[in-house]
Design a protein with these regions (language model features):
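The alpha/beta-hydrolase serine catalytic core
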Residues: 63-169, 173-175
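Active-site catalytic motif of lipid deacylating hydrolases and related acyltransferases
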Residues: 1-37, 157, 179-180
Length: 254
């Protein structure tokens, strides 16, 4: 898939296809660091990569194309405990991977919160592409609980080079055209206040990610909040919703 994407976009766009760490939180942190550094226009992931991309998209503010997303990696891994080989060559030459109970538990912890940062603003900015002959992941119904746009292709779980070029690439091109990179991000608090996202930064003592944001009312004060708290949902009076919901640029500062 990686080589097909690079070939299809050669001379038009840079395609970054790093080997991901086996452990999911480490993989999330690894991809997040690349996003911070490279400022991509679009995330594309397949299977477990799509599982990770879905969690990152609304947080980093980048649309995502999810190919055959596997939202229950624990179900996939449990019957496969033991030593395996990566299917695609790894840049470090290490083709060995070991699935353990501890690894499965790491995935379980992320599965439990994987949709916590979903927001209405991204309901049409995360697209799903599902293989009609996929025998491994069948999660379109779950996808449609959170997102609105799905497509299908006559292939299996792992797309061939030809399928990537015929289906993934045209959808990626369409997303790049429909959702140009945003230079600024705005959010509305559930109590009504409007804010502008400034940046994500690390707490120097705890290494926790925090969001710096500015009020667009009153004295236009700057605020800092843990990133997880900024993006996650809250429950009030039996209703669950985003604490801060991304929106387009406000027409005024109220």
């Amino acid at each position: 898939m990686a080589s097909a994407l690079k070939e299809a976009f050669a001379g038009r766009a840079e395609v970054l296809t790093p080997d991901l760490p086996l452990h999911p939180q480490e993989a999330l942190n690894f991809v997040r660091a690349i996003i911070d550094r490279e400022k991509p226009d679009l995330l594309i992931g397949n299977s477990c990569g799509a599982f990770l991309a879905q969690m990152l998209a609304p947080v980093v503010g980048v649309p995502a194309l999810l190919g055959n997303p596997h939202f229950k990696m624990t179900d996939f891994l449990k019957p496969r405990i033991g030593e395996h080989q990566y299917k695609a060559p790894r840049s470090d030459g290490n083709q060995r991977l070991v699935i353990t109970e501890a690894l499965i538990q790491e995935f379980a912890e992320l599965e439990a919160t994987q949709f916590d940062c979903c927001t209405p603003y991204y309901s049409n900015r995360v697209w799903g592409l599902f293989g009609e002959h996929d025998t491994i992941a069948h999660f379109e119904p779950i996808f449609l609980e959170h997102y609105t746009t799905t497509h299908h292709f006559p292939g299996g779980h792992t797309p061939t080079e030809q399928e990537v070029k015929a289906w993934y690439v045209p959808l990626a091109e369409k997303m790049l055209a429909e959702f140009p990179k945003k230079s600024e991000r705005y959010f509305r608090h559930f109590k009504g206040g409007m804010y502008q996202y400034v940046l994500s930064a690390f707490d120097s003592e705890t290494q926790e990610r925090k969001v710096v944001y500015q009020a667009l009312y009153g004295e236009r004060a700057f605020w800092v909040r843990p990133e997880k708290m900024f993006f996650e949902k809250v429950t009030r009076d039996g209703k669950t919703f985003n604490r801060l919901t991304e929106t387009d640029m406000p027409s005024n500062n109220q």
